[in-house]
Amino acid sequence: MGKVYDWFEERLEIQAIADDITSKYVPPHVNIFYCLGGITLTCFLVQVASGFAMTFYYRPTVTEAFASVQYIMTEVNFGWLIRSVHRWSASMMVLMMILHVFRVYLTGGFKKPRELTWVTGVILAVLTVSFGVTGYSLPWDQIGYWAVKIVTGVPEAIPLVGSSLVELLRGSVSVGQSTLTRFYSLHTFVLPLLTAVLMLMHFLMIRKQGISGPL
């Protein structure tokens, strides 16, 4: 086992990486409220795992979506638990994100030289809310359908381009299969990918610049 470790150590300098990770200075003013960002990340990872599990059974069509969700809840082993965890962690992620934003703002964590960290954080906040909007429609029940109809109809009030934006969001003039397909793609592929990339950038900048000092 030691020879295997030495082989990797010689090529990757594992010990140096571990030392760099574990020896980072933590300011004495840091308290439990500085963990809110990490809790948000944990909720995101739970979302990815539970959401991936549900993709094995969910069917993104207007005729089968609701029935497939019911199947997950009543027939799949622990399906009710997986979906419930997904919903609970979604609510927790939004709450932790909001508290994290307030904590950073109130402690001045957005000030120079951490402006870009703040910008990526704000974008991540928008993506988090977008997860909620797109995921809400996927069961394709009455609540989800009318929520999508209202949300996608909001841009229509924008002069000149409003109607085009509505059609872009819905995939057609009215809410239907194209809308569900778009929201499913956004919820399961586009948004998770963007969130993962921005989270990586966010944490690398925090790692580089360190935690902001007390006010």
Swiss-Prot record:
GO terms for cellular component: chloroplast thylakoid membrane. Gene3D superfamilies: Cytochrome Bc1 Complex, Chain C (1.20.810.10). It comes from the Eukaryota. GO terms for molecular function: electron transporter, transferring electrons within cytochrome b6/f complex of photosystem II activity; metal ion binding; oxidoreductase activity. Heme c binds at residue 35. Heme b 1 binds at residues 100, 202. Binds 2 heme b groups non-covalently with two histidine residues as axial ligands. Binds one heme group covalently by a single cysteine link with no axial amino acid ligand. This heme was named heme ci. Keywords: Chloroplast, Electron transport, Heme, Iron, Membrane, Metal-binding, Photosynthesis, Plastid, Thylakoid, Transmembrane, Transmembrane helix, Transport. It is found in: Plastid, Chloroplast thylakoid membrane. Heme b 2 binds at residues 86, 187. It is a multi-pass membrane protein. Pfam families: Cytochrome_B. The chain crosses the membrane at residues 32-52, 90-110, 116-136, 186-206. SUPFAM superfamilies: Transmembrane di-heme cytochromes. Its main location: plastid. Its cofactor is heme b; heme c. One of its GO terms (biological process) is photosynthesis. Component of the cytochrome b6-f complex, which mediates electron transfer between photosystem II (PSII) and photosystem I (PSI), cyclic electron flow around PSI, and state transitions. Heme 1 (or BH or b566) is high-potential and absorbs at about 566 nm, and heme 2 (or BL or b562) is low-potential and absorbs at about 562 nm. Belongs to the cytochrome b family. PetB subfamily. The 4 large subunits of the cytochrome b6-f complex are cytochrome b6, subunit IV (17 kDa polypeptide, PetD), cytochrome f and the Rieske protein, while the 4 small subunits are PetG, PetL, PetM and PetN. The complex functions as a dimer. This is Cytochrome b6. The lineage of its organism: Eukaryota, Viridiplantae, Streptophyta, Embryophyta, Anthocerotophyta.
